[in-house]
Amino acid sequence: MTTRNTIILAAGKGTRMKSKLYKVLHKVCGKAMVDHVLTQVEKTDMSKIVTVVGYGADEVKSTLGDRTQYALQAEQLGTGHAVLQTEPMLKDEAGTTLIVSGDTPLFRAETFEDLFAYHEAKHAAATILTSMAPDPTGYGRIVRNNIGIVEKIVEQKDANSEEQEIHEINTGVYVFDNQKLFKALHETSNDNAQGEYYLTDVIEILKQQGDIVAAYQMANFDESMGVNDRVALSAATKIMRDRINEAHMRDGVTLIDPATTYIDAGVKIGADTIIEPGVLLKGNTVIGEDCYIGAHSELRNAVLADHVTVTSSLLEDSDMASGSNIGPNSHLRPESHIGPKVHLGNFVEVKKATIGEGTKVGHLTYVGNAKLGRNINVGCGVVFVNYDGKNKHETVVGDDAFIGSNSNLVAPLDVADHSFIAAGSTITDAVNRYDMAIARQRQTNKPNYYQKLPYRGED
């Protein structure tokens, strides 16, 4: 096997996207298109990877980091000109170079491997990746002679009626002999209507020199889909979503309705977990084995251990330990850490809090900036009052405490273990171990006062 390099073309602005975000940074299943391409390239054995950036260069670099080298195309003068910007990094390299666009998120590493293998087997100077398009309109056609050798690539606008009937199209992905690529690039011209240097001109130059130009036809046309507008972005997202969902199902995850299940590319799910319809799993969410994610739940960068149940709830940047459950209609906000066998019932909001093993927060409760120990009971309507108008303060509740319904815990506050807060109390001072705190007015009953009220109802 020869030395292999890759050039990813990611310099275009993408005006048809009609967006402030640069085209290759639009996301497909939670991941930038150019990141999808780089991820698949990384799975192959590459010596060097160079990404050509232009519009939004800093944003692209921030997204991809140091996983690739970068070349800047300051002026957008065509694909050939873009590749030429990598010359300082690649011109002295032997072997072969893959060229792929950053707006083609559906390519698989296996396709690149097959393309390299075909190129090397044919001893070609260039190999074009082609596919059979159901509707080839708009694509460059691959014209072969009667024994299957590539004669030329003809663009839609230049194709005659016979050539327009050809369904084999140019996907825009190539493998070149690296030395011959850069030599031929210096022979290209911008003497055309667009005033640009085209990479396809290199193919013609190599043929004129008598070099072998091959074409490898890939099996799956969908992989070659380029994204130029929001319609294509939606189509690519659907294909990727179906691919991701199928992979999880084959790994032992049950998706009740894959058509309404949305799983980002970075999500990991353990076997025997069940996902109900309408679920969104985003970012770097990790779900263990034997979990149950109920309908219309959304998890964003959440980490769930085994045997966790989520019922119609939103979890953000938080984690839940084994045997815990939440919902329905509850919300874990960032930096929440839920211990084993914790029960968070309906309409519970937790923010930047740690809740210990076996604690129960039944319903209609806000827990913010707090540390709760083990086996605590938090009654209905409890509020952890954490904000003084300027700063957030912390409440600490010890093991085996009991917080009665409709209580307010005003931070900063310490409630010791084995203590008891009476229902309806507003607690502002520390509560010691074994104490019961009551902070409410005594009830006053006024005899016969009902008859003095403007509205008395039926006698």
UniProtKB/Swiss-Prot annotation:
Q: Name one GO cellular component term.
A: cytoplasm
Residues recorded as binding Mg(2+), renumbered to this chain, are D103, N228
- Where are the annotated segments for N-acetyltransferase? 252-459
**Main location per UniProt?**
cytoplasm
At which positions is UDP-N-acetyl-alpha-D-glucosamine bound?
9-12, 23, 73, 78-79, 101-103, 140, 155, 170, 228, 333, 351, 366, 377
Reaction equations catalysed:
alpha-D-glucosamine 1-phosphate + acetyl-CoA = N-acetyl-alpha-D-glucosamine 1-phosphate + CoA + H(+); N-acetyl-alpha-D-glucosamine 1-phosphate + UTP + H(+) = UDP-N-acetyl-alpha-D-glucosamine + diphosphate
Q: How is the cofactor bound?
A: Binds 1 Mg(2+) ion per subunit.
Where is the stretch described as Linker?
A: 231-251
Metabolic or biological pathway? Nucleotide-sugar biosynthesis; UDP-N-acetyl-alpha-D-glucosamine biosynthesis; N-acetyl-alpha-D-glucosamine 1-phosphate from alpha-D-glucosamine 6-phosphate (route II): step 2/2; Nucleotide-sugar biosynthesis; UDP-N-acetyl-alpha-D-glucosamine biosynthesis; UDP-N-acetyl-alpha-D-glucosamine from N-acetyl-alpha-D-glucosamine 1-phosphate: step 1/1; Bacterial outer membrane biogenesis; LPS lipid A biosynthesis
Is Repeat among this UniProt entry's keywords?
yes
Residues binding acetyl-CoA are N386, Y387, S405, A423, R440
Under the heading SUPFAM superfamilies, the entry gives: Nucleotide-diphospho-sugar transferases, Trimeric LpxA-like enzymes
What are the UniProt keywords, alphabetically?
A: Acyltransferase, Cell shape, Cell wall biogenesis/degradation, Cytoplasm, Magnesium, Metal-binding, Multifunctional enzyme, Nucleotidyltransferase, Peptidoglycan synthesis, Repeat, Transferase
Do you know which CDD domains this protein is assigned to? GT2_GlmU_N_bac, LbH_GlmU_C
Q: What class of enzyme is it?
A: transferase
Gene3D superfamilies to which the protein is assigned, alphabetical: Hexapeptide repeat proteins, Spore Coat Polysaccharide Biosynthesis Protein SpsA, Chain A
Subunit structure of this chain's protein? Homotrimer.
Which NCBIfam families does the entry link to?
A: glmU, PRK14354.1
Q: Which family does it belong to?
A: In the N-terminal section; belongs to the N-acetylglucosamine-1-phosphate uridyltransferase family. In the C-terminal section; belongs to the transferase hexapeptide repeat family.
Role, per record: Catalyzes the last two sequential reactions in the de novo biosynthetic pathway for UDP-N-acetylglucosamine (UDP-GlcNAc). The C-terminal domain catalyzes the transfer of acetyl group from acetyl coenzyme A to glucosamine-1-phosphate (GlcN-1-P) to produce N-acetylglucosamine-1-phosphate (GlcNAc-1-P), which is converted into UDP-GlcNAc by the transfer of uridine 5-monophosphate (from uridine 5-triphosphate), a reaction catalyzed by the N-terminal domain.
Protein name per UniProt? Bifunctional protein GlmU
